[in-house]
Amino acid sequence: MEALRLGFSPCPNDTFIFYALVHGRVESPVPLEPVLEDVETLNRWALEGRLPLTKLSYAAYAQVRDRYVALRSGGALGRGVGPLVVARGPLQALEGLRVAVPGRHTTAYFLLSLYAQGFVPVEVRYDRILPMVAQGEVEAGLIIHESRFTYPRYGLVQVVDLGAWWEERTGLPLPLGAILARRDLGEGLIRALDEAVRRSVAYALAHPEEALDYMRAHAQELSDEVIWAHVHTYVNAFSLDVGEEGERAVARLFAEAEARGLAAPSPRPLFV
C-alpha cells in the first residue's frame, strides 16, 4: 500500500506527539510518510489540498473546511499557550509599527489582527523573528512555538500575551493547531487515523524520555530544558481529545473569523 503523507512541524510538541506513530510503537491503519515543514508552509499547502493528513493552524482550517476535517486528537489547544508580542522595550500601541509575523495564515496572526489594527506585518519564518526584533529590523515581533521560552535571551520584553487576552475575552482555552485529514480519505479511515494519533499521544505521555532523541533531532539546537517546557506547555488533555470545551473554543474562533469575512460559514462538522 502506498504511504500516506503526514505533515507536521519540527517543533517538540509535534515530534513528541508523532514519535510513536512514525517509529512503529503504535499501529497505523496505513503506512505513513512523515513530511516535516514549518507550520505556515503546511498552512499554504492545505489551501491547495496537497497533503492528505497534516498539522494546521486553526485559523487556516477555517479556510479549508470543505476539503479537510479535524481529528479530535493530536492538536494544540489550551490555557497559557498563546502567542506573545515582544519588543526591545515597552510599547503603548502597535499602530504604524513594523511587526514581524510568522505567516498570515497562523492563528497567532489572526489573534493579533483581532487585538490591534494599523500595524505593518512583515512575514518571516518564525525562527527569524527574535533576531530581527533584537537587531532593530522591526519594532516588534509576534512569536510562537519555542520562542515564548527564549525571547529573554535576546534582551526583549513582552508587550502582550495574546493567549491571556483571548482567555479573558472569551473565557475559553485558545485553539492553536489541529491535525486535519482530507475528507476524500473517507470517514472510516479518518476515524482510524484519529485513534492512531490518540494512541501515539498516549504512548509519548507514558514514555516521554523515549521521544527525546527524535525531538532533539528536529529542535533547532534547543536545550533539553526548553524542549520539555515546550512539550509541557502544548501537549495536554486536549491533545488526547479536544473535548466539549475545546469544540466550543474552536467554534468561537471560527465565528470571529466569519464575522470579519476571513472565512465562509460551513455546515460541515468541525471534528470527525
UniProtKB/Swiss-Prot annotation:
Active-site annotation: 145 (proton acceptor)
Binding residue positions for substrate: 55-57, 107-108
UniProt key word Lyase: yes
Disulfide bonds: none
Protein name: 1,4-dihydroxy-6-naphtoate synthase
Disulfide bond found in the keyword field: no
Taxonomy of the source species: Bacteria, Thermotogati, Deinococcota, Deinococci, Thermales
Assigned EC number: 4.1.99.29
Molecular function GO terms recorded: carbon-carbon lyase activity
Top-level taxon of the source organism: Bacteria
Matches recorded under Gene3D superfamilies: Periplasmic binding protein-like II
Gene Ontology BP, a term: menaquinone biosynthetic process
Misc note: The tartarate seen in the active site in the crystallographic structure may partially mimic the substrate; it is suspected that the tartarate may resemble the open-chain form of the ribose part of the substrate, cyclic dehypoxanthine futalosine.
Pathway of action: Quinol/quinone metabolism; menaquinone biosynthesis
UniProt keywords, alphabetically: Lyase, Menaquinone biosynthesis
Protein function: Catalyzes the conversion of cyclic dehypoxanthine futalosine (cyclic DHFL) into 1,4-dihydroxy-6-naphthoate, a step in the biosynthesis of menaquinone (MK, vitamin K2).
Family as reported in the entry's similarity comment: Belongs to the MqnA/MqnD family. MqnD subfamily.
Reactions it catalyzes: cyclic dehypoxanthinylfutalosinate = 1,4-dihydroxy-6-naphthoate + dihydroxyacetone
